Amino acid sequence: MEIVNNQNQCVPYNCLNNPENEILDIERSNSTVATNIALEISRLLASATPIGGILLGLFDAIWGSIGPSQWDLFLEQIELLIDQKIEEFARNQAISRLEGISSLYGIYTEAFREWEADPTNPALKEEMRTQFNDMNSILVTAIPLFSVQNYQVPFLSVYVQAANLHLSVLRDVSVFGQAWGFDIATINSRYNDLTRLIPIYTDYAVRWYNTGLDRLPRTGGLRNWARFNQFRRELTISVLDIISFFRNYDSRLYPIPTSSQLTREVYTDPVINITDYRVGPSFENIENSAIRSPHLMDFLNNLTIDTDLIRGVHYWAGHRVTSHFTGSSQVITTPQYGITANAEPRRTIAPSTFPGLNLFYRTLSNPFFRRSENITPTLGINVVQGVGFIQPNNAEVLYRSRGTVDSLNELPIDGENSLVGYSHRLSHVTLTRSLYNTNITSLPTFVWTHHSATNTNTINPDIITQIPLVKGFRLGGGTSVIKGPGFTGGDILRRNTIGEFVSLQVNINSPITQRYRLRFRYASSRDARITVAIGGQIRVDMTLEKTMEIGESLTSRTFSYTNFSNPFSFRANPDIIRIAEELPIRGGELYIDKIELILADATFEEEYDLERAQKAVNALFTSTNQLGLKTDVTDYHIDQVSNLVECLSDEFCLDEKRELSEKVKHAKRLSDERNLLQDPNFRGINRQPDRGWRGSTDITIQGGDDVFKENYVTLPGTFDECYPTYLYQKIDESKLKAYTRYELRGYIEDSQDLEIYLIRYNAKHETVNVPGTGSLWPLSAQSPIGKCGEPNRCAPHLEWNPNLDCSCRDGEKCAHHSHHFSLDIDVGCTDLNEDLGVWVIFKIKTQDGYARLGNLEFLEENPLLGEALARVKRAEKKWRDKCEKLEWETNIVYKEAKESVDALFVNSQYDRLQADTNIAMIHAADKRVHSIREAYLPELSVIPGVNAAIFEELEGRIFTAFSLYDARNVIKNGDFNNGLSCWNVKGHVDVEEQNNHRSVLVVPEWEAEVSQEVRVCPGRGYILRVTAYKEGYGEGCVTIHEIEDNTDELKFSNCVEEEVYPNNTVTCNNYTATQEEHEGTYTSRNRGYDEAYESNSSVHASVYEEKSYTDRRRENPCESNRGYGDYTPLPAGYVTKELEYFPETDKVWIEIGETEGTFIVDSVELLLMEE
């Protein structure tokens, strides 16, 4: 059965069934003009219309086709809905302004047509400049008149129409302005107006739409709900739909035609009687049952309708809906709406499966109404008896009977041809059922989606294709669909945890080999990293930077765009796009509206690259005159912007490239000027002793690569934490300002166990673990090596987000939050004489540690005020108090250490040792020297501390003592620190390192022997001194002799009775008594080792105890290991014996052996006596 297109020739229904029928006919007739025009504009803006086509299309659709009476209907549309009359003066003024705009726009479009036909004609170009200026001026003046106080809601539709026209005109000049003869500055200025006004116009419209909706009553019954729903539907079409396209006017975001889709749903009016307050459900009941909650967009497969019978009236009592998501064949079936009934066989309503006809664009409903009477017990009935569902070819699928309540009265078609002119498709049906006293209401509500939202996601090669994410077919767990903010054309997705976002199926309307780029439109209260998987094989990683604060409302200003991704190809047609968030996050929410895809066309890429470079360069500076850098612009970022500029095409934009290059060089110079570090580009390490970088010899400087444009350093791990890999520099006091905060920052490609310090009063410290990114270059990309071997920084590469937070529980080892690091330190009073400065230190003290870093900066951040100022003054005072205490303690320790050192020598020239100075005495004095604190920084023991001068003075004399001692001991390797080197061995012996870190000779067998030939001076006297220990029975012997005779020996035994040794100075009993007397080992002159090394740790407690201001500084356990500081006392049981020997020849032999048990020898000395 065919249905005539003309909505005024519908088949009438029997009005006697409903004699008091009122379906807001007046409001419907008044709103038809506004709705028709708005739908035509939406159709124009949703399609990929060329820019000139939009200009002329707006004239044909509205500004050149309607007069004062139609503008009056625009105003009446909202007047009737909100019951607010516009004063005659305000109405007439608004209509006059609209007429003036229409008239001037007619002249503008005519001038455009003439110029388009002859674009090089100077007179026509001048005429276009004149007409644009006139058009822009009248719109700037008129639009505020449509937002006058108290009439913001009634004027909202015309405000949006005028705003839409203004943005369209501003887009015209940003695209055609140069061809019209405008200079670049003027074009840029008007483009800035365009981007500034888009969010202003958008947010204004959303605000007053919501205000108007909130002013309508949300109580009562069906009539109030119908008026509320009509306002929502008609202003969605005439206001929200149009502002959802405003962002498309940005000619630099959308330089080519763009295809958009409206995924929002609208609800046509109730098709039953709405006047009787006694009939029908409450407002709240209808809103909750008729309006769907946010969901992925679905498409109707069929309706299965149940029919019930009451008092002889058959009616629609319940139904189920089956549908599918975009690109999915999976069938979705709703629960039963209403009740299940069988008064008639169940009816299945399904459109044709033929493409283009597989939808319903129109319904013709047949309502039935009978009022209940209070006098007689008549049952009140308010139901739908039948509906005709009409397809675009006007074929009808009938439920029982068709009626005359026509959905086209609310959602009209464009023109006469419904095949191409329909505006909406039926997507769903809900139902509200109510039983109240003797009244029954069964209200089906038809749900419609805009024709632009097709049932596929088709990507076309010659336009930008926008795909709302609600057109996915599967949501990830944790992803929710939420109500859109009003300007997105539909609902959006939200996620606050990592995981899969959504999956979409796309159809590619081009060869499969074509390459595409994509970008996101989103809002986020945190930084995020999105992974896009194409067909399960291609992976695109994209950074989504924070656009808003947590808890902030979603507005046009909070939504932003990512850059277009690197080019990729689809692997199949159709293909699947899976979107996920994969890196750890902290707090905040991510909202995504849509993705946009564009063919990776060379011309577009060049235009896009130029625009991106221009934005990046301009964003470096605090103002357009490039006088200063923004504080948050890092040196690394400037290098990356420089790469963008260098990669611009010489053929496409040589002049612009040169101009941008000069600006970037200027930015780099400004960055160098504010950087207080010397040699930040690592021209050398250890080049100058008193300035620049100092570092360990295993650090390497490497030239720029695909990450760093300039030199960077690599710090390897170390096998001994007491000898870390380090890099440091001091910021001189003369460069610092009093009471100022400074920041150290830079870029870390990757690191493990990298420690960063800033030291002044105390140490600010952070350990940084930055996971590496692996290769930046995807397998499908061209080689990253240039023709001369240099990194090809213009090749496509994977990106990472430098600002992502990590998420770790307390106690877990965690990656640092960013490849960009920063650490600040506060400076109090400055003193050039004291020259405290700031130490900058990088250190690695683990075997697995490593780091690659560059673009280091140390720069002034801001003056200290308030609490920060008070805190640094407090820290400075504590530091000075502790320095005074340290100075007092140092004076005491220094005096004791100097006395011990002086006692080793015979005079103040320190060129001769005392005759009885032995190795233990030197070690004891050395340990006292090492009790001087703050000789070196605890954080890095190669940096001199406040007591470095006095420490190095005494330490130098200790080294002199060791040298003099070694010079007079004619036995080589007498302390066995070099194993058995220089000794002759017979049998089995060992050199062992005991737990006191001393090497000792162990003779475990009586047949073993160790000997050494020593050259001496005949006739001179020598002292043979041995420190040893005997375990078990028998004796240990150290013998000295010449070839034929002149033999003497020292014997050691673990005995209890007195033994007498020739020429010996000590017996066993004497040794035991002496050992008890001195509570330790014995030497011929010095007290026991333990007493010599005794120190009171409490006296020399750390002077750094500050906790609240900075990290507490701790003692460096490696500091005492410098020189011979690790020499520890002998354990109890060792004894030192000596004898005098006068050789008669120039050679003697030293032999070590034992009779049984084990003989342990600590040291053997043969010392030349003084003359």
Curated annotation (Swiss-Prot):
Keywords: Sporulation, Toxin, Virulence. It holds the Pfam family Cry1Ac_D5. It comes from the Bacteria. The keyword rRNA-binding does not apply. This is Pesticidal crystal protein Cry1Ea. One of its GO terms (biological process) is symbiont-mediated killing of host cell. The keyword Isomerase does not apply. Promotes colloidosmotic lysis by binding to the midgut epithelial cells of many lepidopteran larvae including Spodoptera species. Belongs to the delta endotoxin family. SUPFAM superfamilies: delta-Endotoxin (insectocide), middle domain (SSF51096), delta-Endotoxin (insectocide), N-terminal domain (SSF56849), Galactose-binding domain-like (SSF49785). One of its GO terms (molecular function) is toxin activity. Residues 1094-1124 are annotated as: Disordered. The lineage of its organism: Bacteria, Bacillati, Bacillota, Bacilli, Bacillales. Residues 1103-1117 have a biased composition (Basic and acidic residues). Toxic segment of the protein is located in the N-terminus.
